[in-house]
């Protein structure tokens, strides 16, 4: 019987096939391992950063976790987010809405948090309680552990670092809230060179909100922040401004109108109406009925 002769080409092809199979299996395992590691890393990173807690068109419930009285009729309310790493993801200068049902009707009121949008785990609202204020009384009656319904973000103003060389801010009462948020963002960012000038109007000295925090920022950043308090009813020995915010005060203490300046207003309607007229008399653009980003004069 003749001996079968092995074909070298067949042997080579067989060996090559085996080698290719091993190489393919090796790289498949490495790829799977890399993918798993990447997925785990991505998941860990996402968990670490947390998630935005707000939904623009849907009210969600957030628990009240603390209440700090800052004047006879105003308090800072701290609300918890679902997870310790969650954030509001609220652009600087925008606001949220609190809603509830009163006498069968939905009532909604907007507030700007004084905490920044990237604050993790909670957010703070500065709210003044008015006798006829449905939402302010609704919140004031809440106890720690109770929930409020909130949605957002909303608003037409978004602050970005160095968007203008200077900002003139005029605030009355709790109208300081969006101004404080903007000031905090600027002063906490060493890359932001914006100069800020604030005229803050109140009735009495006890009505001044966030005074210590504002003056601490001014002390730490004297070249970037100037604060001018104005009181209708000034006590004896008051070292700041008295009366009402007038065109003369605006002209003296705030930046002049220019392409590199924004004038931001927030306060009671009568005050805002007077400030818009004063701004026009000083050469600023006329404020529009609804302010939009890019307007020289913006009303919150």
Swiss-Prot record:
Enzyme class of the recorded protein, top EC level: oxidoreductase
Topology relative to the membrane: Single-pass membrane protein
Lineage top rank: taxon: Eukaryota
Binding site for FAD: 140-155, 166-198
UniProt entry tagged with the keyword DNA-binding: no
Any single Gene Ontology cellular-component annotation: mitochondrial outer membrane
Compartment(s): Mitochondrion outer membrane
Transmembrane segments: 8-28
InterPro entries linked to this entry: CBR-like, Cbr1-like_FAD-bd_dom, FAD-bd_FR_type, Flavoprot_Pyr_Nucl_cyt_Rdtase, FNR_nucleotide-bd, OxRdtase_FAD/NAD-bd, Riboflavin_synthase-like_b-brl
PANTHER family attached to this UniProt entry: NADH-CYTOCHROME B5 REDUCTASE, NADH-CYTOCHROME B5 REDUCTASE-LIKE
Subunit composition and interactions: Monomer. Component of the 2-(3-amino-3-carboxypropyl)histidine synthase complex composed of DPH1, DPH2, DPH3 and a NADH-dependent reductase, predominantly CBR1.
Name by which UniProt lists this protein: NADH-cytochrome b5 reductase 1
Species assigned in the record: Lodderomyces elongisporus (strain ATCC 11503 / CBS 2605 / JCM 1781 / NBRC 1676 / NRRL YB-4239)
């Amino acid at each position: 019987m003749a001996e079968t002769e092995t074909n070298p080409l067949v042997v080579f092809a067989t060996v090559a096939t085996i080698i290719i199979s091993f190489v393919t299996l090796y790289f498949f395992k490495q790829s799977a391992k890399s993918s798993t590691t990447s997925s785990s890393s991505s998941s860990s990173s996402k968990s670490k950063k947390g998630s935005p807690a707000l939904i623009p068109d849907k009210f969600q419930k957030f628990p009240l976790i603390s209440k700090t009285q800052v004047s006879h009729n105003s308090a800072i309310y701290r609300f918890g987010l679902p997870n310790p790493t969650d954030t509001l993801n609220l652009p600087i200068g925008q606001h949220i809405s609190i809603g509830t049902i009163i006498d069968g009707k939905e009532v909604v009121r907007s507030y700007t948090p004084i905490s920044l949008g990237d604050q993790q785990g909670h957010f703070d609202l500065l709210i003044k309680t008015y006798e006829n204020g449905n939402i302010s009384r609704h919140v004031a009656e809440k106890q720690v552990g109770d929930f409020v319904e909130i949605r957002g973000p909303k608003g037409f103003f978004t602050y970005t670092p160095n968007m203008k060389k200077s900002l003139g801010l005029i605030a009355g009462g709790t109208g300081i809230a969006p101004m404080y948020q903007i000031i905090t963002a600027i002063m906490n960012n060493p890359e932001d060179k914006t100069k800020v000038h604030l005229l803050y109007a109140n009735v009495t000295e006890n009505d001044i909100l966030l005074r210590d925090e504002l003056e601490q920022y001014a002390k730490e950043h004297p070249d970037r922040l100037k604060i001018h308090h104005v009181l209708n009813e000034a006590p004896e020995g008051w070292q700041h401004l008295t009366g009402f915010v007038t065109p003369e005060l605006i002209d003296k203490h705030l930046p002049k109108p220019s392409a590199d300046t924004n004038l931001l207003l927030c306060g009671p309607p009568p005050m805002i109406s007077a400030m818009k007229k004063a701004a026009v008399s000083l050469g600023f653009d006329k404020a529009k009925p609804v302010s939009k980003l890019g307007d020289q004069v913006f009303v919150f």
